[in-house]
Amino acid sequence: MTAGSSPRCTPTGPAGRAGNERGFHAVAIDARSPRFDGGIATRLDSIPFGVVVNSHGRRFYDEGEEIWPKRYAIWGRNIAQQPGQIAYSIWDAKAAGLFLPPMYGPAQASSIAGLAVTLGIGGRAVADTIAGFNASIRPGGTFDPGRLDDCATAGLTPPKSHWARPIDTPPYYGIAMRPGITFTYMGVAVTAQARVLRTDGTAFANVFAAGEIMSGNILSTGYLAGFGLTIGTVWGRIAGAEAARQARDG
């Protein structure tokens, strides 16, 4: 599991490192999830279809900045930068069914203020935030959850660039979220043949790496859905072929 420390050695000695030591793939997960090994089922995909507020009841990032496969992996970091490393996803009845249902049921209330109290945050602050959000939505947009639509806010900071609709239809739903780190963007350094490099830049003869352990060679500042599988598949094939060649030829 990822414990937050960079890989520093292999069974045969110190390994070189590659990547961004402050970078990581982190998603928004249900705050009720287990600390370790909760799995992808604890990820929350409601964010684009509502608003996200921090413990002060204020929005802090554009929930509709880009399509979800390009943005879901930044929300863990976004939440980690908020007070207490916690945030709250809020949506209304119109958004129900637009995203994968959460593993644990959301809080539910007939009013925004009531929902905020249930979630343990200030009801007045959240109600004011939602009212300001609703009032800022540009009229005339055509909502389309399958593309970057033209439903956006105007004059609001931060904006919501797409999928902005008034949150005005009860019941209202909400879930507390925390950052869930999947893997870091720092890993062991490898050659183009997937051989692990030592700290002096020379390659181990019989140590190979593929997947997240060496993702720092490729990822540094961002992530697109499927990159992890791609890195594991492509580099796994390379590493397997090279390991077989090493075993055969010595």
Language model region names:
Residues M1-D30, A194, L229, I238:
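Glycine-rich loop(s) and the adjacent beta-strand/alpha-helix scaffold that form part
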Residues M1-P7, F204, M214-R248:
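A conserved FAD-binding loop/helix module that cradles the flavin
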Residues R35-Y72:
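Phosphate/diphosphate-binding loops
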Residues D45-I47, T182-T184, A225:
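Short, small/polar residue-rich loop motifs at catalytic or cofactor-binding pockets
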Residues V53-N54, V190, L197, G232:
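Hydrophobic alpha-helical segments, especially N-terminal targeting/anchoring helices
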Residues R58-Q85, R198, F204-L219:
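Gly/Pro-rich active-site capping loops and adjacent beta-alpha segments
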Residues Y88-D144:
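N-terminal leader/propeptide and maturation segments of large enzyme subunits in energy/redox metabolism
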Residues A125-N217, T221:
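A glycine-rich dinucleotide-binding beta-alpha-beta segment and adjacent secondary-structure elements
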